């Protein structure tokens, strides 16, 4: 396993729509393991392949809050089948939008169909933080970031801040 570099906004790659995976093989499994290791190293709870520069429809997550316990989840070619009309608000952040957080409203429940780590078709009924995390990561597959749900002013302020941060770290 290897820790990969996480791409941060502003970056055109993050706005790209990811392509479906044709089959889950050793290469895809290695990518998923690398993504998980990268996510854990960055103290995240979810990561999409596009965030490490791979435009494939793969996401990994682990929302387990118990210390020293891991419950990794792998989603290949996920498709949301149903969304609850009832909304829930969570404070969201993103490894590709470092140190920025905002309250985002999303459907409180969703049903997602996907291929698991072994390429087996699965159906998951998710609610709460899991549903929010799935929808957040699936947005990445469409080139959407959580800041896109904010007002134009807030979004442009965040992007300006991140651009300055990138410039200052590039100069070091």
Kindly give the residue locations of the regions a language model identified.
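Positively charged
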Residues: 1-172
């Amino acid at each position: 396993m290897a820790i990969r570099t996480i791409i941060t906004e502003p970056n055109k790659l993050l706005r790209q729509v990811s392509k479906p995976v044709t089959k889950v093989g050793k290469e895809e499994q290695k990518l998923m393991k690398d993504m998980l290791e990268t996510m854990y190293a960055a103290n995240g709870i979810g990561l999409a392949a596009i965030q490490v520069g791979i435009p494939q429809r793969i996401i990994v997550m682990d929302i387990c809050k118990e210390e020293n316990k891991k419950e990794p989840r792998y989603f290949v070619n996920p498709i949301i089948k149903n969304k609850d009309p009832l909304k829930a608000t969570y404070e969201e952040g993103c490894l590709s939008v470092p140190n920025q957080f905002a309250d985002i409203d999303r459907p409180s429940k969703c049903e997602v169909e996907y291929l698991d780590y072994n390429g087996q078709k699965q159906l998951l009924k998710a609610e709460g933080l899991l549903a929010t995390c799935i929808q957040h990561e699936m947005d990445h597959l469409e080139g959407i970031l959580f800041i896109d749900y904010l007002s134009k002013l807030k979004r442009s302020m965040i992007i300006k801040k991140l651009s300055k941060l990138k410039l200052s770290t590039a100069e070091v």
